[in-house]
């Protein structure tokens, strides 16, 4: 790819913290559009090129609205992180935080816990909402009117999990951003 000047862009809904094992297996260091387009990350320079985040005030309003509509829901956030250096426990600092009332419904049991209010103290790439009593489609019907147009609701599995992000954070929009900005060019 590098010899032919063909850029490699990895686009995924997965968080940045999941990607080092992927790019370490590749012959080139790719650009990574991750967290559904909330981040553009240069794996060669180990640098976040662009963030499109939900701001603290927006997050607070969104969490409160959803919590009123779905009091049984559990919350977590994916933050953008400063770099890709782990603190030794496999987690990047401040990346994935779980509201303390939600321990049993998240697969990442070693992730740090915090209060529901503290989830929205800093901007986040994604707000995750889990409700085991409803399907994701049922949840989306309830949540979309509460967050539109401030945020965008998506889900990839119908098991009661929603991902909420900034409305401009999409993989397609970020790919176009990379191309127009010239970040798809061959890198050293």
Model-predicted regions and their roles:
Residues 65, 72-188:
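Conserved acidic, metal-coordinating active-site core of Asp-based
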